[in-house]
Amino acid sequence: MTRSAALFCRPVPAILFILSLLILDQAIKYAVEVSLPMHELVPVVPMLGLFRTHNLGVAFSMLSHLDAWVIVVMRLAIVAFVAWLWRQTSRDHQFAHLGYCLIIAGAFGNIIDRFTYGYVVDYILFHTETWSFAVFNLADSLITIGAGFILLEELLVLRRSKG
């Protein structure tokens, strides 16, 4: 059985998709910056709220002691590596190509924040009365979901090779 080439292995659809996600990410972050109070929980539904904060580091505020330019260069190097992996991926691995698009969109979304604000805008908070998860943003979610799609593709490849 032949599988068709993945939509997002083609440059134009991939770039348009990434740009659309970047515009959405930046529009939300701008709205958060101008509308939400700093460090005040705005409940959305039980266990989910908006909570505006600034992240000077990377995931979970790690490396916040480093100069902003070091973090930007590090992120650009990671994006370059992800782009290289993407180009090495077989054209019929649809989930992997989608995953790489999501990761690159998310990474660039946070890099743009660094240049625009000097920090990354975080605003999504999962919580209960006694517990809360780290505050994150759409770009972080795109990176995580993208990694999930790449892992899914690897599992499917493994399953196909055994079948």
From Swiss-Prot:
Its main location: membrane. Belongs to the peptidase A8 family. It comes from Allorhizobium ampelinum (strain ATCC BAA-846 / DSM 112012 / S4) (Agrobacterium vitis (strain S4)). Keywords: Aspartyl protease, Cell inner membrane, Cell membrane, Hydrolase, Membrane, Protease, Transmembrane, Transmembrane helix. This is Lipoprotein signal peptidase. This protein specifically catalyzes the removal of signal peptides from prolipoproteins. It is an enzyme of class 3 (hydrolase). It is a multi-pass membrane protein. PANTHER family: LIPOPROTEIN SIGNAL PEPTIDASE. Its EC number is 3.4.23.36.
